[in-house]
Amino acid sequence: AQNPATKGEIRWNGIPVWENKEALSHICFSRELNQVSGNNMNALRIKDYLQAAEAFLPHWDKQMADSLVKQFQLEPKKRINKLSKGMLSMVTIIVALASKADFTILDEPVAGLDVIAREKFYHLLLEEYENTDRTFVVSTHIIEEAADIFEEVIIVKEGKILLKENTQDLLDRSYHVSGHADQVDAACAGLAVHHAEQIGRSKGVTVLLEEGQTI
């Protein structure tokens, strides 16, 4: 059984997904793993964990899963609760990509990965996107690094959508202003400030310009 939504409704092509096997067959939610997941799944070996995932994902590509295990240099017999943070992220990436689900959600897939591993993930994600009709939704805090690979950005805070926009359009009107706090405040007066940091007399802010505004 799934956890019911506390508010609203989730649909796939107009079909409610709650306990709906047909709708769920098109969706994969690859969540962030940890060593103490609260169930017995974290005691499984990698190969057994992936086998369990296969049982719930009808379009599973075992050949791809096996290939990704080798590419990430994971040990199939190693247990989930013995993996590092980066290795746990690799497992979630494998589940997401090998699921072959039409609509795939990845929760913080690059957490704990080094730069090389993150670049490998972005390459694999783009390759899969270009070769299929799949849609990927990726939650991440490393926005600058991932900006070039996403078509659309959605910023969510405390369950509310603050912004939903084409990536390039958003980049074209986004600016980071830094310098002496008084000068930064003067330059950004009247503008929408979305983030600000101040250390001593130095300040940096991120602003989004509306139509007709300049800085």
Features from the language model and the residues they span:
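Residues immediately C-terminal to the Walker A/P-loop in P-loop NTPase nucleotide-binding domains
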Residues: 1-3, 128
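Conserved catalytic motifs of ABC-family nucleotide-binding domains
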Residues: 100
